[in-house]
């Protein structure tokens, strides 16, 4: 038994924790979840459960009803196998080979320098705990574990009709105990490609790298309204304000690592006249203090560095640089519109997530989210106009639908009544500004009744990710009670 497994055994008798410890021990970042999928398949077979896999790679496991519950509606428990691979710049970790190193920090479980994978590892562990249990009461159970949710919802897109028999789907990918979700935002990837021209580094120019790091980052849906800094946009702001006066020539812009994570770090390599280096140092320091004044209450660990950099490639031409920097500085980011119908919920947003530089092009990958297709289309149009003005190409891909709330949902009413019966108050019924797979499941299974719930997870998609221990116990209590209260199938 690992150190973590021994440690969490002291938390409670909750069967979720041993499964989560095992999940953490098997690398499973998006696009590299095969080892964990195979482990789960082999484990399920050892339990005598029926296991199937579709051509996309999704895993399906069936468990018969417990005695006396055979006449209940079938329930599909659903989670995704993959996790977001994010680490601090100074953390040495290969997500395809190295296990996550979780530990207990007071009331929370978190990880050493990396994302924890509680999103959606806790939900996945709850599905396995139901399959393993010989004690809880339930009707016919199916477990659906999808692949590649975080990097493109590949598994949900690939789900075909005829694979699931259940009437009700319980999605475990929500991140606030006390809230139950009945709707979510849709989204689309938007990638700019700027074709760039380069020329020789001017005589007398030296290299410097501007580094901005230490931002909180986080989930580009759930955290987009919190006012956190976007490293890509903050660096663009400095370049737009000072490149001309300092004669800065751009060599490389690199920032962010995932379209659905608010970028925490950005790195910009420039060439400039040696006589302007001291002025650059002054202005960059002054800009850092400005950002701390603006964002300091939210971004308590924001830091910048200016380092000498040996130049090994040419600089962008002045025209190429001007149109790229102007476009990036102009590009909208963050909350576009709040919902008029649901108080406190973001309706439409944009995250300028990842910027990469190659020899002859710069790519900027964004993620648009919206509760309404019309809101998504509006932002698509804004970005298309920006691309046209900047002479860039814009590719829109991977569009996925939102999950429209159903006020008549039977399982929602059952969850609400169950929750109130246990805790004496109703849960908050919510719509989430993030992409749950439920919206995609509605296409092959339009009559499936769905809700989403889970424990409290803070700062998902960032190395600060953590899950609150006591809410995992509450999550399990709710899962057990909900399964026992599934109605008889008509």
List PLM regions with ranges.
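Zn-dependent metallopeptidase/amidohydrolase metal-coordination segment
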Residues: 8, 13, 340, 347-360, ...
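Active-site-adjacent substrate-binding region
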Residues: 223, 230-232, 236-253, 405-448
């Amino acid at each position: 038994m690992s150190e973590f497994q021994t440690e969490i055994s002291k938390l409670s008798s909750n069967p979720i924790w041993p499964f989560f410890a095992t999940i953490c021990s098997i690398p499973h970042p998006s696009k590299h979840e095969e080892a964990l999928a195979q482990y789960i398949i082999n484990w399920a077979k050892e339990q005598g459960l029926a296991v199937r896999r579709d051509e996309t790679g999704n895993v399906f496991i069936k468990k018969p009803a417990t005695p006396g519950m055979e006449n209940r509606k079938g329930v599909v428990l659903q989670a995704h196998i993959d996790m977001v691979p994010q680490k601090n710049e100074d953390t040495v970790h290969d997500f395809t080979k190295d296990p996550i190193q979780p530990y207990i920090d007071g009331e929370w479980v978190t990880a050493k320098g990396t994302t924890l994978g509680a999103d959606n590892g806790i939900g996945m562990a709850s599905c396995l705990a139901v399959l393993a249990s010989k004690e809880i009461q339930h009707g016919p159970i199916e477990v659906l574990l999808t692949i590649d949710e975080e990097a493109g919802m590949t598994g949900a897109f690939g789900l075909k009709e005829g694979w699931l028999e259940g009437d009700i789907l319980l999605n475990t990918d929500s991140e606030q105990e006390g809230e139950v979700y009945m709707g979510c935002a849709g989204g689309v990837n938007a990638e700019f490609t700027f074709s760039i021209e380069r020329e020789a580094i001017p005589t007398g120019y030296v290299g410097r790298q501007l580094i901005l790091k230490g931002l909180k980052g986080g989930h580009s849906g759930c955290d987009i309204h919190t006012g956190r800094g976007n490293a890509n946009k903050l660096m663009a702001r400095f370049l737009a304000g000072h490149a001309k006066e300092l004669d800065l020539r751009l060599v490389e812009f690199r920032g962010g690592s995932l379209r659905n994570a608010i970028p925490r770090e950005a790195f910009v390599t420039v060439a400039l006249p040696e006589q302007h280096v001291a002025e650059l140092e002054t202005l960059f320091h002054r800009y850092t203090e400005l950002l701390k004044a603006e964002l300091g209450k939210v971004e308590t660990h924001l830091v910048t560095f200016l380092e000498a950099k040996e130049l090994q490639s040419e600089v962008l031409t002045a025209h190429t640089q001007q149109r790229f920097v102007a476009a990036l500085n102009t590009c909208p980011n963050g909350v576009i519109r709040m919902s008029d119908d649901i108080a406190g919920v973001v309706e439409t947003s944009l995250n300028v997530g990842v910027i990469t530089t190659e020899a002859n092009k710069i790519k900027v990958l964004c993620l648009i989210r919206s509760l309404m297709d019309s809101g998504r289309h509006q932002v698509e149009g804004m970005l298309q106009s920006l691309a046209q003005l900047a002479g860039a190409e814009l590719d829109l891909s991977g569009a996925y639908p939102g999950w429209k709330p159903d006020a008549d949902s039977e399982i929602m009413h059952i969850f609400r009544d169950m929750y109130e019966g246990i805790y004496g108050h109703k849960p908050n019924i919510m719509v989430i500004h993030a992409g749950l797979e439920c919206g995609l499941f509605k296409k092959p299974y339009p009559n499936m009744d769905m809700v989403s719930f889970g424990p409290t997870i803070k700062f998902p998609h960032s190395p600060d990710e953590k899950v609150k221990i006591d809410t995992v116990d509450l999550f399990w209590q709710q899962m057990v009670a909900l399964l026992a209260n599934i109605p008889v199938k008509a």
